[in-house]
């Protein structure tokens, strides 16, 4: 494989289903390597499977990259010198290359059926499941004529050199496949339609891709692609053979490969749950790579400055939801307050029942109260919904109420109500001062005992944003209405 200076990588998904975290991790590593080296990222779409491909999936892939802030230098939606960038629009190109390969003798027609191949293996005492036996590569003209007379339509196979295949993988180091494991393989169907095994390397060659970074599942196909590249170079279609790097599997629970059926595999599930792009990007980068042994939190600029495919680990990476959320929490805290406020407002409006017309100045305060208390944006709803719930609709959490609204809670509730009724200017400092005096100083209660019943009374929950600030946001009237209603339910009895 040639040594290259101007890095050109590609991301070439098929538009099926929703974006998978493993797929997006592959896109991220290609993008980060292109940006780190000052190279180019080519984004093309492999949409030749009419039965499975969809425009909805295509749009979802575009949305996923844009959500994460990954751009591309050439490709769909952008254009470039190697248009078109959708395989469904490149069929004439593939037919032309296939014809050149046929004319040069690099590929040949193969008429054998699968049953005939198995029978030949059995007759020779070999495992019948060994695969194709290269029988048709040297058919005589008479044999070809006989097959044609039967009405057989051949598939087209590439002549694989009889040699062992060795290369230095960018991730895995020295890799070797023995020659007997690599029979001649099909590059075009019997109807002349080129297969992925042909069109993918042809696109890479024509788009001058220098580094192929892809999933570990494609490792066994590399010898075939290396052989095809040699053939493409001989007919003048390819200039060089790219370097290959095979990225580690992403594993799910129980050390099984993360499948599309796993909820954790869907990028948009994480987005909809309130993972922010910075947190997702950071975590995806850790699925096979790390900045340093003692630093898990980093931004996109640090990723670009430090990412090298040579540092990617070959071992499988396990997807850990708790770690993703912990990293996301750090990135939420790193946001500027105004930025966080805007993102939270947009999220709450789209994904929750939080009203879009809630006063901006109050929302700014509420956002500040929860920024350090949530791991994902969706958690803000449970913390803030009490602010937009009608007083008469507030429901007390039974478990929390049973624990905190015992007979002993009547006294702090009465004292708290009396103290708050006397507050004239309804501000956090005044609320705090009044309650501290009435409950801590005068009654001698510990804060947890003093304020537990009040917190449940205004929010319905044992956990809420800071109590005094919450009361200010809620307003004096609603605060007192709720506390008096809570007093009427104390001691709290769980309904049968």
Curated annotation (Swiss-Prot):
It comes from the Bacteria. Transmembrane segments: none annotated. ATP binds at residue 260. It is found in: Cytoplasm. A motif ('HIGH' region) lies at residues 13-23. Keywords: Aminoacyl-tRNA synthetase, ATP-binding, Cytoplasm, Ligase, Nucleotide-binding, Protein biosynthesis. Its main location: cytoplasm. Its EC number is 6.1.1.17. InterPro entries: aa-tRNA-synth_I_cd-bd (IPR045462), aa-tRNA-synth_I_codon-bd_sub2 (IPR020751), aa_tRNA-synth_I_cd-bd_sf (IPR008925), Glu-tRNA-ligase_bac/mito (IPR004527), Glu-tRNA-synth_I_codon-bd_sub1 (IPR020752), Glu/Gln-tRNA-synth (IPR000924), Glu/Gln-tRNA-synth_Ib_cat-dom (IPR020058), GluQ/Sye (IPR049940). GO terms for cellular component: cytosol. A motif ('KMSKS' region) lies at residues 257-261. One of its GO terms (biological process) is glutamyl-tRNA aminoacylation. Coiled coil: none annotated. It catalyses: tRNA(Glu) + L-glutamate + ATP = L-glutamyl-tRNA(Glu) + AMP + diphosphate. GO terms for molecular function: ATP binding; glutamate-tRNA ligase activity; tRNA binding; zinc ion binding. Belongs to the class-I aminoacyl-tRNA synthetase family. Glutamate--tRNA ligase type 1 subfamily. Monomer. Catalyzes the attachment of glutamate to tRNA(Glu) in a two-step reaction: glutamate is first activated by ATP to form Glu-AMP and then transferred to the acceptor end of tRNA(Glu). This is Glutamate--tRNA ligase. It comes from Corynebacterium glutamicum (strain R).
């Amino acid at each position: 494989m040639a040594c290259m200076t101007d890095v050109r990588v590609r991301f070439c998904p098929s538009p099926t289903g929703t974006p998978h975290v493993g797929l997006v991790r592959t896109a991220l590593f290609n993008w980060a390597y292109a940006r780190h080296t000052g190279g180019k990222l080519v984004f093309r779409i492999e949409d030749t499977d009419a039965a499975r491909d969809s425009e909805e999936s295509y749009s979802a892939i575009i949305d996923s990259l844009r959500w994460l802030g990954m751009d591309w230098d050439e490709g769909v939606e952008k254009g470039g010198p190697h248009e078109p960038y959708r395989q469904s629009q490149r069929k004439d190109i593939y037919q032309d290359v296939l014809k050149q390969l046929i004319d040069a003798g690099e590929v040949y027609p193969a008429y054998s059926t699968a049953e005939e191949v198995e029978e030949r293996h059995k007759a020779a005492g070999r495992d019948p499941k060994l695969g194709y036996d290269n029988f048709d590569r040297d058919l005589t003209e008479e044999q070809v004529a006989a097959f044609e007379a039967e009405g057989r339509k051949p598939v087209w196979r590439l002549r694989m050199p009889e040699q062992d295949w060795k290369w230095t993988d960018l991730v895995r180091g020295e890799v070797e496949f023995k020659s007997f494991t690599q029979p001649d393989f099909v590059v075009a169907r019997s109807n002349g339609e080129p297969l992925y095994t042909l069109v993918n390397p042809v696109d890479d060659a024509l788009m001058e891709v220098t580094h192929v970074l892809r999933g570990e599942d494609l490792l066994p196909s590399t010898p075939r692609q290396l052989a095809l590249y040699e053939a493409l170079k001989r007919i003048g279609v390819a200039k060089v053979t790219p370097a290959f790097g095979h990225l580690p599997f992403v594993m799910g629970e129980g050390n099984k490969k993360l499948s599309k059926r796993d909820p954790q595999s869907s990028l948009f599930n994480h987005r909809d749950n309130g993972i922010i792009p910075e947190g997702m990007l950071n975590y995806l980068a850790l699925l096979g790579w790390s900045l340093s042994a003692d630093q898990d939190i980093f931004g996109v600029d640090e990723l670009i400055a430090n990412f090298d495919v040579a540092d990617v680990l070959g071992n499988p990476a396990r997807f850990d939801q708790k770690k993703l959320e912990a990293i996301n929490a750090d990135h939420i805290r790193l946001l500027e307050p105004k930025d966080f406020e805007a993102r939270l407002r947009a999220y709450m409006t789209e994904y929750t029942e939080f009203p879009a017309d809630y006063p901006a100045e109050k929302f700014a305060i509420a956002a500040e109260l929860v920024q350090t208390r949530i791991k994902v944006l969706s958690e803000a709803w449970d913390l803030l919904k009490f602010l937009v719930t009608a007083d008469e609709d507030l429901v007390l959490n039974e478990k929390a109420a049973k624990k905190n609204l015992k007979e002993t809670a009547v006294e702090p509730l009465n004292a708290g109500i009396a103290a708050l009724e006397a507050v004239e200017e309804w501000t956090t400092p005044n609320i705090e001062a009044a309650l501290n005096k009435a409950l801590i100083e005068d009654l001698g209660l510990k804060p947890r005992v003093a304020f537990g019943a009040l917190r449940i009374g205004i929010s319905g929950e044992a956990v809420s944003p800071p109590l005094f600030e919450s009361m200010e946001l809620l307003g004096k009237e609603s605060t007192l209405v709720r506390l008096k209603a809570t007093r009427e339910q104390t001691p709290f009895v769980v309904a049968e």
